[in-house]
């Protein structure tokens, strides 16, 4: 039943305009449009292009796409259907999380495959570690997206809150320009956002980075679980 629920959510997301726009259309258009500009401005951008664009895909999909989808589940008729049929409310979060994980990973794989062919981007030095860091960042960011979707009921406020997290994640993490160009206090501020640690782990892996991402995931997931329990009462 659980696998059926995940598969059903995956198929529903394929038909969802929100998922299509936030997970595939906008990130991939940004990738194909901006990659050439990045490389023209800074030829060394080929070294980090795959990681930079993957971080953008992850943050766009998880922070902009997930909250409205969860809002539809827990703010509308779906929640009543869950209760009427005795389905645990947490199932909606888990299926949305797993479905979004797969869709976002597919978009990241498109970037991984297309960047070397289209823009001469360099592959990561250690591909397995790169994908471990990508998966960790994806889990953390999806957990934050779920937290936003559960904590804010109206779609307008969800979008506003998501943008408050999304824009600093993109601008301060180092994917648009070297983080060293930022003032010192903004470099410290950037560390608050998972995208910063994730991008560093994907480009210059250090042993401490994955535990930090794991801790951030546990905090976001724990907060989401508390909110879900409150909503269930």
Predicted regions and their residues:
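Short hydrophobic, aromatic-rich alpha-helical segments embedded in or entering the lipid bilayer
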Residues: 1-7, 177-211
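Hydrophobic alpha-helical transmembrane segments of multi-pass membrane transport/permease proteins
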Residues: 12-40, 46-65, 105-107, 162-171, ...
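Alpha-helical transmembrane segments of multi-pass membrane transporters/translocases
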Residues: 23, 27, 33-36, 132, ...
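Hydrophobic alpha-helical transmembrane segments of multi-pass membrane transport proteins
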Residues: 29, 46-115
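Transmembrane helix segments
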Residues: 33-40, 151-192
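Short helix-capping/hinge motifs at transmembrane helix termini and TM-loop junctions
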Residues: 34-42, 67, 115-123, 152-153, ...
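Transmembrane helix-loop junction
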Residues: 35-36, 72, 112, 116, ...
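Alpha-helical transmembrane segments and their short interhelical loops
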Residues: 89, 97-162, 167, 207-210, ...
């Amino acid at each position: 039943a659980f696998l059926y629920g995940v598969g059903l959510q995956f198929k529903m997301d394929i038909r969802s305009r929100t998922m299509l726009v936030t997970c595939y259309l906008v990130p991939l258009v940004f990738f194909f449009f901006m990659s050439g500009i990045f490389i023209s401005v800074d030829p060394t951008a080929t070294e980090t292009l795959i990681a930079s664009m993957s971080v953008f895909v992850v943050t766009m999909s998880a922070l902009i796409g997930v909250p409205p989808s969860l809002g539809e589940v827990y703010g509308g008729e779906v929640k009543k259907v869950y209760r009427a049929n005795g389905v645990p409310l947490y199932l909606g979060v888990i299926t949305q999380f797993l479905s979004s994980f797969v869709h976002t990973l597919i978009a990241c794989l498109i970037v991984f495959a297309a960047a070397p062919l289209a823009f001469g981007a360099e592959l990561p030095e250690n591909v397995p570690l790169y994908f471990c860091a990508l998966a960790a960042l994806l889990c953390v960011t999806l957990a934050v997206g779920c937290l936003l979707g559960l904590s804010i009921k109206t779609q307008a406020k969800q979008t506003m809150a998501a943008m408050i997290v999304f824009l600093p994640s993109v601008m301060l993490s180092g994917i648009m320009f070297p983080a060293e160009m930022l003032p010192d206090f903004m470099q410290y501020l950037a560390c608050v956002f998972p995208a910063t640690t994730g991008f560093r782990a994907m480009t210059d892996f250090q042993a401490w980075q994955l535990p930090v991402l794991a801790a951030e995931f546990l905090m976001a997931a724990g907060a989401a679980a508390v909110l879900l329990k409150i909503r269930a009462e």
